[in-house]
Every structure is written in structure tokens, then in C-alpha cells.
Amino acid sequence: MAQSTTSETHTRDLDRDCTTLSRHVLEQLQSFSPEAQDLAALMQRIGLAAKLIARRLSHAGLVDDALGFTGEINVQGEAVKRMDVYANQVFISVFRQSGLVCRLASEEMEKPYYIPENCPIGRYTLLYDPLDGSANVDVDLNVGSIFAVRRQEFYDESHEAKDLLQPGDRQIAAGYVLYGASTLLVYSMGQGVHVFVLDPSLGEFVLAQSDIQLPNSGQIYSVNEGNFWQWPEGYRQYIREMHRREGYSGRYSGALVADFHRILMQGGVFLYPETVKNPTGKLRLLYEAAPMAFLAEQAGGKASDGQKPILLRQPQALHERCPLIIGSAADVDFVEACLAESVP
């Protein structure tokens, strides 16, 4: 009996180690069609970008030009970190010759990067935040990368990328990479949320958890309370209520990926409200809020801008910003109720 149990354990371990990103995508799509193979290859390329960024981060204090600022200001009006530039270039380099995408849109670029005509051109667009929470790099805290995959809706001859201005429910895949104690890649193609861990000995992302489900509620709220007096009253009302409730904890790291991953695993809610300084919100809709909302809903949670689901919000611009309330369904509902009650 003991030998049988040991054998079954070894079989499960081998099955897990053999479930790589590309294999998992093909299993999810239940197809070996050219489109399915392209999506599997695309996800594998995202994994390659993650490995390169993870390697650079692990040597951040030992190599030149990894820490600190470049002295430039990006399209968002934010000071550019050296690792922002590196991570953005990694994604471009990984996909330029891949034949999988026609363009890439990033937080770090005012306009999308179009694959040159002398390179193979694919049918997909990758939208991404190359290094979320990059202010954490210099103090060795968690950071991440966020991505979303969309089909090209029509031929973009004018290079205005207007077909990208579609609600988040048009995404065909979304996910993030968390660079921390281990490197995790979390993704969904509309069939649940799945977690992969980078195994350094194999050099591969292997499946760690399938079909993650967000608890209906949790006892964690994640928000930068330093902005308390800049928020609309409904958010302040919610925080006051959390302070009164026993057992609730505030956790905030400054990286959306890290904070959302905690919520995904343990339940609760992440908030990034609009403020007096940023009346339309701070997070970017297309490559931060919408990908995370896609994951939250696939895991049984919710994501809202305070008035409507994030995935139903119609973007008007590539770098459009929005408020974000995301996490366990009951907790998001409660925040929305606080906002509704505060409206005169």
C-alpha cells in the first residue's frame, strides 16, 4: 500500500512538472489549430520575457543601470525607472521577430509599437505594464508585469489603434507575473485562473494551482490610506467601517500585482480610488485595470470603477485612467454600497 501511495505521488509530481505554459494553453483550448498553437507560443513568449526580467531583478544591485531613474518622464508624466525601460524593451525584443503579434501597447510608450514590415506579423496585440510597482525595485520589494491579449479587429493602416478601444470583455487572455520569493505567472483565457511557478532547475513555468476561486469575502483591504482626505466620501466611509470591525487588516505594498495576488489567494478587496489630484483615477484601464478585472471575474470575484463593472467600461483613449475596486464579490458590493449611500 505504501509503495502504491508513493508511486501515485511521484506520478502527480511528474504530471505537474510536465504541465508547462504552452501545454496548458493547448489543453485549455482543446485544439491544435493554428490559432491555438499561436496562443500557446504567445504565452510561452510572455514566459520568456518574465524569465529575463526576473533574472535582471535578481541582479539589480550587482549590475549597472538596474536601479534608480533615467532622468526622463514618460507619457504618464511619471519619472522613468531604469528597470521600467529594461522591462519594456524585453517585451519588444521577445515579440518583434515572433510572428505572433502585430503591435505592442505599453505604459511606457505614448503610441503602440508596430512590428516592422520586414518582420513576421501576427494577428494579436499585446497590451502590458512591463514593470508594475517599479518604485519597489530599489528597496527590494515585490513588483510585477501585467498583460492582456486582444485580436486585431481590423487593419490598422493609420496606426491609430482605434480597434483597441474596446471594453475589457473583448480580451481573449490576461494575466500577470509576480516577481517575489518565487516568480509566479497567473493567467486566464476565459476558462478559470491558473498559477504557474518558475522552476529554476527546469527553466520552465510549471503548473502549481488550477481554477483558483476567490473567497466570496475576506478580511483584508488593500489601499493607500495616505490619500484618505483626497477621496470621495464613500471611500472614507468604507475605511471608517473597516476600522470599526474586529479582525480586518489593511495591507498595501505599492504594487498592484502583489496586492491583488494576496486578495486572489486570501479574499478581500483592493481599492485605488479617484482623488482630488487624480479625479479620473490613477490606474490605466487597458493594461492594468481590465486585465486584473478579467482575472477577478474568472475567479468568481468582481471588479468595478465604482459605478459599473470594469469589463463593461468603454475606453476613449489608449492610456485612459480609471478608479478600481477589485476582489471578493461581497466586499466589492459593500464598497459600491458605501459609495451609493454617500451620493447626495
Curated annotation (Swiss-Prot):
- pH curve summary: Optimum pH is 9. Activities at pH 8.0 and 9.5 were approx 67% and 85%, respectively, of that at pH 9.0.
Q: Which cofactor does it need?
A: Mg(2+)
Under which pathway is this protein filed?
Carbohydrate biosynthesis; Calvin cycle
Keyword entries, A-Z: Calvin cycle, Carbohydrate metabolism, Cytoplasm, Hydrolase, Magnesium, Metal-binding
Q: Which PROSITE patterns match?
A: FBPASE
- What is the top EC class of this enzyme, as a single word? hydrolase
Q: How is its activity regulated?
A: Not inhibited by AMP and slightly innibited by hydrogen peroxyde.
Q: Where does Mg(2+) 1 bind?
A: 107, 129, 131
GO terms under biological process: fructose 1,6-bisphosphate metabolic process; fructose 6-phosphate metabolic process; fructose metabolic process; gluconeogenesis; reductive pentose-phosphate cycle; sucrose biosynthetic process
- What family is reported? Belongs to the FBPase class 1 family.
Please report the name of this protein according to its UniProt entry.
Answer: Fructose-1,6-bisphosphatase class 1
Origin organism of this chain?
Answer: Synechococcus elongatus (strain ATCC 33912 / PCC 7942 / FACHB-805) (Anacystis nidulans R2)
